[in-house]
Amino acid sequence: MGSFSMGHWLIVLAIIVLLFGAKKIPELAKGVGKGIKTFKKEMEDETPVEKIEKADSETQSTKQNETTKNV
């Protein structure tokens, strides 16, 4: 019940071809590929921002410690 057989996948593929047409499928696949590539690139770009946020939080905690010492 949990997995599809080859026959099920062929039926799904036939329905997709009927809905979108044979010419549109490569364009759709290309769009999905670009979306995945962009998503992965953005995920890699997140790392420097996280490092900056971590450095900012460490700076703020240092300032709080200095303020506490001055009081």
Swiss-Prot record:
UniProt xrefs under Gene3D superfamilies: 1.20.5.3310
Ligase among keywords: no
Keywords, in A-Z order: Cell inner membrane, Cell membrane, Membrane, Protein transport, Translocation, Transmembrane, Transmembrane helix, Transport
CC per GO annotation: TAT protein transport complex
Location of the protein in the cell: Cell inner membrane
Feature: compositional bias, Basic and acidic residues: 41-57
Disordered: annotated segments: 41-71
Topology versus the membrane: Single-pass membrane protein
InterPro entries with a match to the protein in the record: TatA/B/E, TatA/E
Extent of Polar residues compositional bias: 58-71
HAMAP family in UniProt: TatA_E
Role noted for this protein: Part of the twin-arginine translocation (Tat) system that transports large folded proteins containing a characteristic twin-arginine motif in their signal peptide across membranes. TatA could form the protein-conducting channel of the Tat system.
Protein's name in the database: Sec-independent protein translocase protein TatA
Lineage of the organism: Bacteria, Pseudomonadati, Campylobacterota, Epsilonproteobacteria, Campylobacterales
